[in-house]
């Protein structure tokens, strides 16, 4: 499916139906995600660990966090969750999800600022309550004002924990692009590498785009976390499988206790 973020007009959510009458149906209004703010970016993730994808919308002005209630309705809970950031002139340019502290709940990094509006970037820690806490300083990230264009999470040093890369939009007038290494112990994380067999082997696409990964408690058989390989945010690592070297999508779960089982469902 495809979510399109617009400026000064309704956003659109296109459901991929793969039908004879046309592959996509616009359902943004029907599911209450046709936000009309000045949109900057959207970021999908299952922040509440209920097995479906929610979406954070970065805006000029008030941000939105749409909780997915079973695929039939989205509810904007940004204010209650503490991530609305609706102050005068506030500009959020991008957002990225990762469980940086390995507690089993996804955290949210917001890249902020613009041409004439320098602002601090923010890291919000998720928890069981669903209310995010500002952990920018406690995580060791700078709280100075800047203007960031984007941010992304990936394990660049291969130590098992997600690291953060933030891009600066003002060249010599700003701090430059920044790479923050996550020093938390790898035993708090579980890494899953996912790769499709490809169309020549009648399998899923090699990049595993669309694959659904569930982390399951081995004792209770309950799903405790869910992630999906998405095209814009998929992290890729080179691996060898069955004598063939190629790219695989990397999914990192915060896994503070175990044991766990992992279920992977490929598209198609």
Language model regions located:
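Hydrophobic beta-strand segments that make up the repeating blades of beta-propeller
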Residues: 1-6, 54-59, 108-113, 164-169
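Hydrophobic/aromatic beta-strand segments within beta-rich folds
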Residues: 24, 54, 74, 107, ...
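Repeat-based blade/solenoid architectures
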Residues: 30-43, 81-96, 138-153, 235-248, ...
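Beta-propeller blade repeat segments, especially FG-GAP/WD-type strand-to-loop junctions
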Residues: 9-27, 62-77, 116-135, 173-189
């Amino acid at each position: 499916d495809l979510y399109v973020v617009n400026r000064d007009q309704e956003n659109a959510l296109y459901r991929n139906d793969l039908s004879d009458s046309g592959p996509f149906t616009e359902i943004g209004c029907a599911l209450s995600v046709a936000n009309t703010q000045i949109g900057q970016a959207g970021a999908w993730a299952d922040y509440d660990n209920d097995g479906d994808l929610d979406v954070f919308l970065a805006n000029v002005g008030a941000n939105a966090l749409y909780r997915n209630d079973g695929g039939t309705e989205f509810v904007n809970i940004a204010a209650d969750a503490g991530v609305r950031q609706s102050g005068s002139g506030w500009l959020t340019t991008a957002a990225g999800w990762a469980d940086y502290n390995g507690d089993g709940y996804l955290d949210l990094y917001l890249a902020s600022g613009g041409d004439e509006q320098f602002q601090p970037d923010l890291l919000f820690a998720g928890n069981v309550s669903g209310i995010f806490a500002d952990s920018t300083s406690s995580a060791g990230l700078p709280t100075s004002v800047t203007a960031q264009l984007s941010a992304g999470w990936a394990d660049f040093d291969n130590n098992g924990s997600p690291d953060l890369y933030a891009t600066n939009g003002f060249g010599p007038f700003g701090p430059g692009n920044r790479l923050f290494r996550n020093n938390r112990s790898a035993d708090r994380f579980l890494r899953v590498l996912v790769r499709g067999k490809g169309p020549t082997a009648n399998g899923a696409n090699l990049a595993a785009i669309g694959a659904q990964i569930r982390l399951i408690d081995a004792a209770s058989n309950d799903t405790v976390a869910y992630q999906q390989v998405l095209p814009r945010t998929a992290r890729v690592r080179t691996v060898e499988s069955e004598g063939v070297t190629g790219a695989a999508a990397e999914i990192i779960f915060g896994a503070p206790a175990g044991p766990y089982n992992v279920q992977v469902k490929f598209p198609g």
